[in-house]
Amino acid sequence: MKDSDKGRLKAAALKYDREERDAPHLVASGSGRIAERIVEVAREAEVPIVEDAALVSALLALDIGEEIPLDLYEAVARVLAFIYKVDVGSR
């Protein structure tokens, strides 16, 4: 996920493995050059990138490794559903 706020790129990366954890957790976040690198790595790995300014702002408040809070479940579920749809459609 990425967001350009006042010209400064912001990005956050989530991981979700049902067998590993109960909820998605933050694996990377940052702004500026760090955000650019997060987006670059995602593109290289062919990971879908979703833009959601409100969600990325909320995710930037989390610590790396922290599971998303309940109030973000719905927004993250929409992102995961979109990614699943894109992934299935590309097969």
Regions found by a protein language model. Give the residues of each.
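Divalent-cation
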Residues: 1-91
